[in-house]
Amino acid sequence: MKKIGIFYGSSTGTTQGIAETIASKLGVPASDVIDVSKMNADMVKEYEVLLLGTSTWGDGELQDDWYDGVKVLKESDLKEKTIALFGCGDAESYCDTFCDGMGIIYEDIKDSGCTIVGKVSAKDYSFSSSIAVIDGMFVGLALDDINESDKTEERIDAWVSDIKNHLASVSYTHLTLPTNS
């Protein structure tokens, strides 16, 4: 059985809250929702599915704890891993760097041999620019809980459903498969 680990970097608690919400919707226990500042190579090795969440700070900068987290990921064997990204940003005040932190992590892991899932269309977002967008798709779930908090739950639900559908063909621990209703 494969395990899902959720690693997040959060300075104000928003990304942590999003990570916990995603965990709840996927049935991932709280013990597998980990602050990236505590992440090490053994933890990365333990999970075959990694959900990586970050906020974006300043002028498109990665959340501080992720700088060491990215080093751990680069030193880890990610070839057999399935990875999904989620990011928090402010599309109004920082419309030119919306969710760039997620794009930075993507750039650092994209050539590692991992399988990246959970891309989201950028068409329903209002922003100017983001390095987290490639060919009209965010590299993961982009959230603006400051200006579009009314869309957060719906966006998380759609993304979690996409992740579940992708992973449904393989048996994973902690994964609650979608029901037909």
Locations of the language-model features?
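Short acidic loop-to-helix transition motifs that present clustered carboxylates
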Residues: 35-40
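Compositionally biased non-globular segments, especially hydrophobic aliphatic-rich helices
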Residues: 145, 179-181
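N-terminal beta1-alpha1 ligand-phosphate binding loop
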Residues: 4-21
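FMN-binding flavodoxin-like domain, especially the glycine-rich phosphate-binding loop
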Residues: 3, 25, 29, 34, ...
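Conserved small/polar residues in nucleotide/adenosyl-binding loops
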Residues: 173-179
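Charged catalytic carboxylate motif
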Residues: 14, 18, 155, 173
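Short amphipathic alpha-helix with an adjacent loop that forms part of the alpha/beta core around
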Residues: 41-45
